[in-house]
Amino acid sequence: MGKMLSQVDVRTYWDFIEPGLREIKKEAKPEWRPEDIYSALASGIAELYVDIEQDPCESFIILQVKPSVFKPTQSLLIWVAYDKRENANGKYMEYIEHMAEQRGCNKVEFWTPWKGLADVLSHIGYETKQYIVEKEI
């Protein structure tokens, strides 16, 4: 199996992950603010995973188990995946997929503004299922 990730407390790792969240915020312009992510993690809505063997910590994953609205299933939704190194999917994807299975999820989902990530994931069995089209009013 791929490299192991460990669930950690955001209060301990915030100083390590905040710069990466701010970088993502600047590049992708998601609706969330880093403070929103902190709140979701501290309140247990989402979970933070890091590679604790990495020093300094420059990669992390924020995820949530998400029930399906229409079926009695659930997915492991990756909110944020950040890694300063190359080939993070090769390092962690097998572990993430195994984690999803162990937690009773029938799929892993990524919501991303980057077509490049969707293209990379398509080479390891992921498929784009829908596009989200919106207009601010």
What is each of the regions a protein language model found here?
Residues 43-86:
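Conserved donor-binding loop and adjoining core beta-sheet/short helix segment
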Residues 1-32:
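Short amphipathic alpha-helix that is part of the acyltransferase structural core
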Residues 46, 123-127:
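Short glycine-aromatic motifs
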Residues 64, 111, 132:
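Conserved residues at the C-terminal ends of beta-strands
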Residues 37-39, 66-69, 98:
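Short, flexible, glycine/charge-rich loop motifs used to bind or transfer phosphoryl groups or to couple energy/partner
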Residues 127-137:
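Conserved catalytic-core motifs of GNAT/GCN5-like acyltransferases
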Residues 73-124:
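Acyl-donor binding region in acyl/amide transferases
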Residues 27-48:
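Active-site rim helix/loop that mediates acceptor-substrate recognition in acyltransferases
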